[in-house]
Amino acid sequence: QRQNELLTADYDLKTHLADQEAETLLVQDVDQALARALEGMCDLLSSLPPLTDESSSHERYRMLQRAKMLVAYCKRKGSLTLAQHGESGFDRDRIQLIANELASDLRTIDVDCASIIAIRRPMHASTVSALYDCVYDFAFFAYTTDHPALMYHLGDHDRCSVELRAALFSNDDADLSQTPAAQELESALQGRNVAYRL
């Protein structure tokens, strides 16, 4: 009996410590992401061209829209640290709600977006955080294209991982994989803790 109580207490302690470590890592990840996004917003705002003609007006508009995307990213990413408390994970309905909010954010900057969420198991906040990063990486890439439509599917890959598939449709004639924005996308994905293929 005493041995069982000790084993249970040991298990509970290890679980609590693992949860604390995961929470600490998530807070650090979110903190670093918000710092990078804030730096990006400051860079954008400090480099706005003066309003001299229609071309500069259009360029300012595009840059301000990009800053708006960064604000939305910060809002969604920061909410993860609050959303994880007292929760057993992010289930399909909760992820679908997040995806709908994200799609709504993107539509306000003329990136048409739709998603299918087909996960069967709840996901940890750190997984959702990595998915946010990847979806926004694709969204920033999509914003560089002509009349973009971004579609993505999130489903279970195996018992321990999920798979995010994204497809971008645009009116561009050029090969988008050869653009500087595509190189930025690949560089961003390389910096994430994800396996990917473009």
Where are these regions (language model features)?
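Conserved signal-transmission helix
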Residues: 1-23
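Conserved DxG motif in ATP/Mg2+-binding regions
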Residues: 160-173, 198
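Short beta-strand/loop element within the Bergerat-fold HATPase_c
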Residues: 55, 151-165
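Conserved short strand/loop->alpha-helix "switch" segment adjacent to the catalytic nucleotide/phosphoryl-transfer site
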Residues: 15, 19-25, 108-139, 143, ...
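ATP phosphate-binding glycine-rich loop and adjacent ATP-lid/helix-beta elements
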Residues: 172-198
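Conserved DHp (HisKA) dimerization/phosphotransfer helix of two-component histidine kinases, i.e.
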Residues: 32-116
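Conserved ATP-binding N-box helix of the HATPase_c
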Residues: 36-49, 124-153
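Amphipathic alpha-helical regulatory segments at dimerization interfaces
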Residues: 101, 105, 137-144, 188-191
